[in-house]
Amino acid sequence: AEQLQRLKAEFQANRYITEQRRQSLAQELSLNESQIKIWFQNKRAKIKKASGMKNGLALH
């Protein structure tokens, strides 16, 4: 549960995580980097789908 809260907070601050930030989060949360990367991708996709946008570029 704590991991999820941290990921959500990080996502709120920045939808695109940097490699350096991903590495440090992975260590802090005892996850591997690819798990964090995929979580961010899935979260962005879920938001895009929920907003009904056809073009992801319009999110910027």
From Swiss-Prot:
SUPFAM superfamilies: Homeodomain-like
Compartment list: Nucleus
Gene3D superfamilies: Homeodomain-like
Record's keyword terms, sorted: Developmental protein, DNA-binding, Homeobox, Nucleus
Main subcellular location of this protein, as a coarse class: nucleus
Any one GO molecular-function label of the UniProt entry: RNA polymerase II cis-regulatory region sequence-specific DNA binding
GO biological process: neuron differentiation; regulation of transcription by RNA polymerase II
Top-level taxonomic group: Eukaryota
Keyword Nucleus carried by entry: yes
Cystine residue pairs: none
Transmembrane segments: none
Residue spans binding DNA: 1-41
Pfam family, one: Homeodomain
GO cellular component labels: nucleus
Role according to the record: Required for proper formation of the apical ectodermal ridge and correct dorsal-ventral patterning in the limb.
Membership in a protein family: Belongs to the engrailed homeobox family.
Protein's UniProt name: Homeobox protein engrailed-1-A
Organism placement in taxonomy: Eukaryota, Metazoa, Chordata, Craniata, Vertebrata
